[in-house]
Amino acid sequence: MANLIVVCGPQAVGKMTVAESLRDKLRYNMMMNHDSIELSDRIFGFATPAQREYNAVIREKAFELAVKHHVDLIFTYVCAFDIPEERDYLMKLKDQFKDGGGEFYFVELSADLETRLARNETPHRMERKASKRDVAWSRENLLKDAEKYRLNSAEGEYWFEHHLKIDNTNLDPDEVADRVIAAFHLTAREKTEKEYRFGV
């Protein structure tokens, strides 16, 4: 069996750093949404039809193999809660891992816009995400999406049995990870470092 933890929230809310902390505390493997985005962008260009299709193929195969080979996974994702297809996609992921005998956990992060704009320009973010190094474009994209989409759920809106909401405006990643682990009663796996964080 394989568990999936989806760390969700708007751009620059802190998904990557929280996921990294969860990875190190739980010894789960990790796939950022930008892992597949950056690769498909390099090959097919930004937001082209081929890029979108290849990005989806990479993710689908990763989830398939995680379930097949019993690899616990953390996945970061930006969700537009006002688009029905987003819920359909996440429900499909939930069913995929539950049908394989695992569990599905949904962690939703939120932070105020000022905090997100500051986090958008951190050196760690620039290092890990090549597409964010054009700071002016990245800032404009963040502001545009904040205006266009509902990137956090409404008060009292819960999509999943295991759906945890955390405002991490004033929390560091380790504090958030500890809350997630406690809320879902998660335990660390027995893995060597090379099995879950090779090359990072």
Stretch-by-stretch model annotation:
Residues 17-67:
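Conserved substrate/cofactor phosphate-moiety recognition/catalytic segment
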Residues 122-176, 197-200:
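Small-molecule kinase domains that catalyze NTP-dependent phosphoryl transfer to phosphate-bearing small molecules
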Residues 7:
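Hydrophobic anchor at the beta1->P-loop junction of P-loop NTPases
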Residues 14:
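Conserved glycine(s) of the Walker
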Residues 98-121, 166:
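Conserved phosphate-donor/acceptor-positioning beta-strand/loop module used by diverse small-molecule
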Residues 182-200:
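C-terminal accessory "lid"/substrate-recognition subdomains
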Residues 11:
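The conserved Walker
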Residues 54-108:
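Glycine-rich phosphate-binding loop used to anchor ATP phosphates in small-molecule kinases
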